[in-house]
Amino acid sequence: MLFEQIAANKRKTIFIILGFFIFVLMVGAAIGIIVWNNYLNGLILAAVIGAFYILIMVMSSSSVVMAMNHAKEVTSKDQAPVLWDTVESMAMVAGIPMPKVYIVEDASPNAFATGISPEKGAVAVTRGLLNKLERYELEGVIAHEISHIRNYDIRLSTIAIALVAVIAILSDLAMRMIFWGSLTGGRNNRKSDNNNSGGAQAIIYIVALIFVILAPIIATAIQFALSRNREYLADASAVELTRNPDGLIQALQKISGDSKKMEEVSASSESIYFASPLKSKKNKPGLFDSHPPISSRIERLENM
């Protein structure tokens, strides 16, 4: 059951990522139709901007994420021996280099990982998590975060965030070009061969325009769907490492029962946390939820 869940989650992720890239190209094609009456120009624009933005995002240092979330590096085992040993042992089991270790001075129990590859990985936990969890529960959480690093989830989420940003940029660019085109009479200079073709072009233009307007919303929903799927995969992978689903289950129960919200959370970092720092109590995932409901995660773990 465990390995079936892991395989199913990986397949689902591949479909989501492929769909995401196709969606970006569709947005580019729609913009090409709207602005130049030529979808190919839009495809090229989307591909160029997308490749450039993804490159910039992937090259960004994980230290930026740590700074945004007020995480301080643990530079020696003496500073946090239990945490250090747990990260070291889980990394060894996962077969990756030991990630850098950070602590966020916040009373709410939570954790996150960053780093686009296992060689550049880092794990951060809140002070509340260290104070609230037993050793075996902490192992479950750390195994979950180590799994994100081993599965290249941070790289995937970085690409997803970049693609959402690219779609927002393309959509905004299209609106500006339409505005300036309307002022200069750009589209009025395009003549149709006959009334029928002119009517068809108008319909295509309107459909493309609606698609471009809705694209940022749809892209955000796709990004969060990917995020929720990777959380399930990291849970399953954590059990593969610890061979103890109870530790992760009890950690999730304790975090769910804790009412404290994190004091300072970067909005752009919400999706990387172990559990939503906004403390959502939903039992069903919404389109714009970065995490699946904790009750759903526990149910899947209990069925392993």
Curated annotation (Swiss-Prot):
Descriptive protein name: Protease HtpX homolog
Source domain of life: Bacteria
Binding sites annotated in the UniProt record for Zn(2+): 144, 148, 231
Gene Ontology cellular component list: plasma membrane
Active-site residues annotated for this sequence: 145
Listed Gene3D superfamilies: Metalloproteases ('zincins'), catalytic domain
Pfam families, per database record: Peptidase_M48 (PF01435)
Annotated EC: 3.4.24.-
Residue intervals passing through the bilayer: 14-34, 39-59, 159-179, 202-222
Gene it is expressed from: htpX
Record's bilayer topology term: Multi-pass membrane protein
Family: Belongs to the peptidase M48B family.
UniProt cross-references to CDD domains, sorted A to Z: M48B_Htpx_like
Enzyme class label: hydrolase
Main location: membrane
Obligatory cofactor(s): Zn(2+)
Compartment annotation: Cell membrane
GO function terms (MF aspect): metalloendopeptidase activity; zinc ion binding
Example GO biological process: proteolysis
Keywords in alphabetical order: Cell membrane, Hydrolase, Membrane, Metal-binding, Metalloprotease, Protease, Transmembrane, Transmembrane helix, Zinc
Keyword Manganese on entry: no
Cofactor binding note: Binds 1 zinc ion per subunit.
